[in-house]
């Protein structure tokens, strides 16, 4: 352990970052689980809530690409300070989530993005993938279960 790891400052900073990431994930789950939102509305809302989970939210921007559409935080622009995670369906990429810092930020030992932030973006992309699948399967399951219900009622 180095001196900073032993100090309360490191522990407190580390805890604050984990709390931000966890709160971000809670907000993401609330958005993804809102049945009133369409997929485009979900993507727009996610670009609004996601920056709060990163180390430098004031310069953090998000873009979600799905199919031919792109949804992004106002002020988003390509940056050398970015991380990406694919949105997949059937194991194939159908889009991506991109988080960027639009200005240079302090580079830690882990890089411009913390390891936990890299895990966070992958988790969010995975949850988006699950939500898309769920949204497409809902009508199929409803249709599939309806005839069965009628058959059982007829007995």
Put a short name on every predicted segment.
Residues 25-73, 154-155:
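Helix-loop-beta substructure at the N-terminus of cytosolic sensory domains
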Residues 88-105, 131:
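Sensory-domain boundary capping and coupling elements
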Residues 2-31, 97, 127, 134-155:
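Signal-transmission linkers at sensory-effector interfaces
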Residues 1-3, 7, 108-131:
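Amphipathic alpha-helical "output/dimerization" segments
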């Amino acid at each position: 352990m180095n001196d900073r790891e032993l100090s309360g400052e490191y522990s407190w900073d580390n805890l604050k970052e984990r709390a931000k990431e966890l709160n971000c994930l809670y907000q993401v789950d609330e958005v993804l689980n809102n049945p009133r939102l369409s997929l485009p509305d979900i993507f727009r809302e996610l670009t609004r809530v996601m920056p709060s989970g990163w180390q430098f939210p004031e310069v953090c921007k998000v873009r979600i690409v799905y199919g031919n559409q792109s949804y992004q935080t106002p002020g988003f622009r390509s940056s050398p300070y970015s991380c990406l995670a694919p949105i997949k369906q059937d194991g194939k990429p159908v889009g991506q989530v991109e988080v960027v810092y639009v200005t240079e930020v302090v580079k830690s030992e882990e890089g411009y993005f913390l390891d936990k932030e890299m895990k966070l973006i992958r988790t969010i992309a995975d949850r988006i993938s699950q939500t898309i699948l769920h949204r497409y399967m809902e009508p199929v399951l409803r249709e599939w279960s309806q005839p069965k219900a009628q058959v059982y009622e007829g007995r």
